[in-house]
Amino acid sequence: MEYRKGKVNYLKNLYIAEKPSVAREFAKALKINGGSKNGYIESEDSVETWCEGHLVTMSYPEVYDPKLKKWSLDTLPFLPEEFKYELIDDVKKQFHIVERLLNREDVTCIYVCTDSGREGEYIYRLV
């Protein structure tokens, strides 16, 4: 709990799961009995959200150079100096929800609750 200008502001933990069903199970296990919002669940001291699987993907080669749109053995290997990423169209809305929650002033601790394997870690890392 934090005091600001005579008001009590509750600091919150943010839990980020890989998908909605896992987020609901985490919320149940952690006794987060808050209201369900659009893309997250919030209680007095916690927020639970999810990624819906991958929210971000690597850009296709033609984003780096239009000549790479047509596949050719001559252009391999293709190793950019810096990788480019883009949001996946179907889940842009959820990406922006997670982004907004990550940047809230009242969020003081972030728990990554994606799968423990390589893929789960990668899903969160790109967010």
Stretches with model-predicted labels:
Residues 2-127:
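Intrinsically disordered, low-complexity regulatory segments
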